[in-house]
């Protein structure tokens, strides 16, 4: 009986795995984020329409990019997850995409967070967006 439980325990340990997708995605810090976005305010009013996005500075690693994807809002860290933090690794909004300012100009979809044209190790770091009513959303992690 002890052998049975010993073998069962070993099988259980071998079945556990880590998340290999995030193994090389260690450039961005896991900083606390808690931002209120009221779509009735002028600086966020364009988020009432699909495909529009805004940049919120001084949050996360490089600011936050928020986009209306048609079914709600999605929020991404504006720092390129495939670069060490630097001035050039802060992305700029280009329509429905975000482009890194470094020489390789990594480009990501703001709808999915995935890279465009080139397979990269890491996608954009996403933050949780929850509705708190009255056209107000909370962005947090």
Kindly give the residue locations of the regions a language model identified.
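Sec-dependent signal peptide recognition
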Residues: 2-9
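Compact Cys/His-rich metal-coordination microdomains
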Residues: 98-100
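Acidic, glycine-rich flexible loop segments
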Residues: 115-117
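N-terminal pre-ligand scaffold of iron-sulfur
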Residues: 20-95, 106-110, 125-141
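C-terminal motif of bacterial Sec signal peptides marking the signal peptidase cleavage site
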Residues: 12-15
